């Protein structure tokens, strides 16, 4: 498959996954005043002023001035603190110039990795288990070392409620959960995310076991692709590549405060 076609599939999946989050916020956290609108072929989402999911995902390669203006108006009306476009590398030179001219700057990047299914999967080094909601919330917050305030507990709650998702963990010999991870459907894509390992359990193969188990579940469910977003040169990237994923592209975040 051509890389451009795969990027399109993944970006469509990212927008769909973001919409699932918005709907979960609307249903389970109505005070967040979550909202969404189509934007440049993707989705603009508001899920709270401090939420990392207040962003645009899935935008196409050609961002028109009118589409950027519409997104800015959407976020302004919803009292967002900034406007964020998370864009694939197919963004045209003209689109980049439009963003720069309006004051956008690059705030960060993430690597998108993918595995075509079916694929070979080694047996997990640990036995993954499905997590109960209390364990999920506790490990989610501790693994990501998030403060117990503002958006953090809400993100854990909403992620748990994501439709069709599977929430997994790995426990030690005493039954204490050492890490968490999630798989969520987005069309033909299984989105692998929310990978977190408690600080004291890192380096023990927890994430690798959870990646392998989600690959197994994704194949059983008939997905064509498994996709994840990781920080460049991170241990997570190494673990995913070790499990058979390949780097597909780097997504760039353009921000205007």
Residue locations for each model-derived region?
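Conserved GNAT acetyl-CoA-binding A-motif
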Residues: 78-88, 218-231
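Conserved active-site alpha-helix within GNAT-family acetyltransferase domains
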Residues: 92-106, 204, 208, 220, ...
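Conserved N-terminal entry element of GNAT/NAT acetyltransferase domains
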Residues: 1, 36-40, 116-132
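A conserved beta-turn-beta hairpin within the catalytic core of GNAT-like acetyltransferases
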Residues: 46-57, 107, 185-193, 202
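A conserved beta-strand-loop-helix scaffold within acyl/acetyltransferase catalytic domains
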Residues: 148-200, 249
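Conserved acetyl-CoA-binding loop-helix of GNAT-fold acetyltransferases
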Residues: 64-73, 194-199, 203-220, 242
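N-terminal charged segments
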Residues: 1-76, 150, 160
């Amino acid at each position: 498959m051509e890389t451009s076609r795969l990027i399109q599939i993944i970006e469509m999946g990212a927008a769909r996954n973001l919409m699932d989050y918005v709907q979960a916020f609307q249903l389970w956290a109505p005070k967040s005043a979550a909202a969404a609108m189509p934007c440049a072929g993707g989705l603009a989402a508001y899920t709270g002023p401090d939420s990392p999911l207040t962003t645009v995902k899935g935008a196409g390669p050609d961002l028109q001035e009118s589409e950027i203006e519409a997104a800015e108006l959407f976020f302004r009306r919803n009292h967002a603190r900034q406007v964020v476009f998370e864009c694939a590398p197919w963004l045209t030179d003209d689109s980049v110039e439009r963003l720069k001219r309006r004051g956008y700057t690059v705030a960060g990047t993430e690597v998108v990795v993918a595995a075509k299914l079916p694929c070979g999967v080694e047996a997990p080094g640990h036995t993954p288990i499905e997590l109960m909601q209390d364990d999920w919330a506790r490990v989610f917050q501790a693994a990501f070392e998030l403060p117990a305030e503002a958006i953090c507990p809400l993100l854990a709650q909403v992620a748990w409620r994501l439709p069709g998702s599977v929430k997994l963990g790995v426990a030690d010999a005493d039954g204490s959960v050492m890490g968490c991870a999630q798989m969520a459907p987005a069309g033909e894509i299984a989105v692998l995310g929310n990978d977190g390992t408690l600080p004291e359990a890192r380096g023990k193969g927890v994430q690798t076991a959870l990646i392998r188990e989600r690959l197994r579940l994704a194949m059983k469910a008939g997905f064509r692709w498994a996709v994840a977003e990781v920080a460049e040169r991170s241990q997570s990237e190494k673990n995913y590549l070790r499990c058979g994923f390949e780097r597909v592209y780097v997504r760039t975040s353009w921000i205007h405060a």
